[in-house]
Amino acid sequence: MLPEQIKNFREMVTLKDKAYVLLRPMVREDESRLIEFYSMVGGDDLCYLHHDVKDPAVIRDWCEHLDSGKVLPLLAFDHEHIVASASLHFYEGPKRHIGEVRLFLARDYRKCGLGVKMVRALIDLARKQELSILMAEIATEETKMIKAFESLGFKTQATLDDYFMLPDGDLHDVVLMTLPLRMQTEEF
């Protein structure tokens, strides 16, 4: 169950074009809006997503089985329409101190600062969950996204050759980036 501080999280962010977007955690009632949002996704964007978001059953499953102990999904709304999705994935066992960040923005909401603001919100939420490290996997050709994560303090830890396979079987390299969340003892 979500702690109250996360469950009640709401943040209105201002984009570069002065538009306002609301960030809040996903709830079960977002199913139809998510189906609408992902129905617009096509082409290259589909290749990089972890799930078949065009299948309404996938979205329905997400909404019906929300488990904040495994995934904390954060949505961005422009009025009543979802324009971006970010998620914080939790691990168990020896990786329980690590969270993984994933992010997807509608094409019209890229290059306006929304992605950085959403990842910042996930960083804050991860700290509230007392995680030690955040990680992100980004295809090496996504240089602008890599730079955006670097601007937030993420560092490249490794490049994984042929780590990501597109639907056509084409292999791509991925950079593994991490952000330490706990202050070192010499910091104050």
Question: What kind of feature is each model-predicted range?
Answer:
Residues 109, 113-121:
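Conserved acetyl-CoA pyrophosphate-binding loop and the N-cap/start of the following alpha-helix
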